[in-house]
Every structure is written in C-alpha cells, then in structure tokens.
Amino acid sequence: MIGFRTLFYKESLRFWKVATQTVAAPVVTAMLYLVIFGHVLDGRVEMLEGVAYTSFLIPGLVMMSVLQNAFANSSSSLIQSKISGNLVFILLAPLSHAEILAAYVGAAVLRGIAVGAGVFAITAWFAHLTFVAPVWIVVFAVLGAAILGTMGVIAGIWAEKFDQLAAFQNFLIMPATFLAGVFYSVQKLPPFWLAVSHFNPFFYMIDGFRYGFFGQSDVSPWTSLAIVSVFFAVLTAMAINLLKRGYKLRH
C-alpha cells in the first residue's frame, strides 16, 4: 500500500506542478467551445425538452474535458517514462500489477475531475443548470475518468513513441468523444448514425452524466451504467494482462 501511495503521489504531483498546462489550458479550450457553439446555436435548437442549448452543452463539455484529460495523464506519463528509461524503476519496485494500474488510473481520475470541476466552475455562469440526480453526475464522472485513465495506460504500453500515442488519441479518443453526443442529442441523428452511436461506449458516459443534471437522457442511466461498467472491467483486465506480460515494457 505504501508503494501505491508513493506512485499515486508521484503521478499526481507530475501534472499538478504544471497545472497551467494540464488544468488551466483545457478549461480555456472548453470555454472557447461554449462561446462559439453556445452563442451561435442557443435559442435556435433544442436538444432536450425545456432545456436551453447552452445548458445542454455545458455537461457535455465538462465530461469531454474529464475524459480527454484523464486519458492524457496516464498515457503521456507512461510513454515519457518508457522513452526516458525510468519506467524500469517502477517495474522493479515491490508493487503488484494491480497497484501500478490503480496508481496511474487514480492520478488520471484526479486530473480529469480537477479539469472537469474547473470547466464547470467557469461555464456554469453562462446558463441555468439543475441537479436532478447529483449521484449520477459523480458516478459517471469518476467511472468515465477511470475508463479513460485505463485506456491511457493501455495506449502508453502499446505506443513506442509520441507519434504513435498521438495517432491513438487523434484517431480513436477524440472522434469517439466528439461523436458521443457532446454537442447534440443522438436522437436528432438519422437512423443509421443513431444505431452507430449506440456502439460507442463514450456515448453512454456522456449521456448518463447529462442525466444527472436534467433527469432526461437518450438511454436509461441504468443501461448506461451497466454498459460502462462492463467496458471498464474489460479494459482493466486487458491492462493488467499487458502489465503481467511486460508487453513492450521489458525490452
């Protein structure tokens, strides 16, 4: 447990020492999205009944920031350690594979939630928000951050250089996030794309998170929770298996 706490502290301190880049910058980016999309579309479209577009958009931006930054934290840390050669010291430490994964994912969750809280604190002034089911907000925020933190560990193990990690993020994480209903309700999509959206696990994270604010969602929050939980369990098993095998870590 001491080893886990030490690694978790190291990973948390790593992003907090450069909080201007790792926390403040994503908040500014989310603000730009809100100003552009909220200003142009507010009053012109309605995604949920009785909910202004800007109000609808804010939970999506918060969750998008949580997910993307949780992934960035664990993936960048691992690839940086691999390239610099200091990952060997973590692998040689008396830590179980589960403890290593938990420390990286825990720090990723911390950064994701910190960024999400920052985005919410700034954007909440621009619209009226309700909190119909705050428990769902917390559950999906933490679970979503943990999933992306685990995906970041997998990506960091797989990638051998920053270019490969960037490809993973640009061709998988960002499209999956943007196409998950951040800016729109999937019910507004044509039937084909509506069906495709239901195969995107990111959609269930964002939809369940938004339900906590408005009590309305495209899918039952219980269904979303079940799908997201299974997805997390599968990713966790994959990550631990890769760590046990030492895949691209021991050479």
Question: PLM ranges: what are they?
Answer:
Residues M1-V135, V139-H251:
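Hydrophobic transmembrane alpha-helices and immediately adjacent juxtamembrane helices
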